[in-house]
Every structure is written in C-alpha cells, then in structure tokens.
Amino acid sequence: MQTLVFFLIAALGEIFGCYTFWVWLRLGKSILWIVPGVLALIVFAFALTKVNASNAGRVYAAYGGVYILSSVVWLWLAEGVKPDKWDLLGVTICLLGTVVILFSHYR
C-alpha cells in the first residue's frame, strides 16, 4: 500500500510539473508557471526514492503503469478530454505489466 501511495504522489508531481512547462511553452503563459512545476518535479523524484526496492530501474518500470493511468486521468479531469477505448486498453495493458513487476519482485 505504501508503494502505491508513493507512486501516486510521484505521478501527480511529474504530471503537474511537466504540465507547467506545457502551459508556459505551448500555451504561451508566463514563465512563472514553471516555479511550482520545478518544485513538483522535485517531489516526484523524492517520492520514487521512498519506494522499498533495491533497483531504481525496477521501481521506474513498475511506476510506469501508475504514471500512464494517472496521465489518462489527468487528460480527463484537468484537460476535459474523455479517454476513449484505446486509451483504456493501453492503460489496462500497462497496469498488467506493473502488477507482474510488483508481485514478482516486491513480495
């Protein structure tokens, strides 16, 4: 359960942090948008270090599925775009990979 909490914190930090750069560079908003974005990216990196695992690459691989799910939720809630069946199928496939990695290495 603790792993999932840190993955969700990391996902929110990463998505929000990267989105602030999108807002600045793609939507033409103020560069000041990146100030909270950089802080969010620091939270993202810190959260992944709190996952109980000895290999960074394995943590990142398992986190990938949670990140993808969180990105699709962000697409829907923050950007107002409803995910289609292909988005949901992709998320499902990725989460299956996350489960395989988590249950085979984090027991």
From Swiss-Prot:
Secretion signal span: none
SUPFAM superfamilies: Multidrug resistance efflux transporter EmrE
Disulfide bonds listed in the record: none
Protein name as it appears in the record: UPF0060 membrane protein Ava_B0196
Compartments (UniProt record): Cell inner membrane
Annotated membrane topology: Multi-pass membrane protein
Transmembrane domains' residue ranges: 4-24, 31-51, 61-81, 86-106
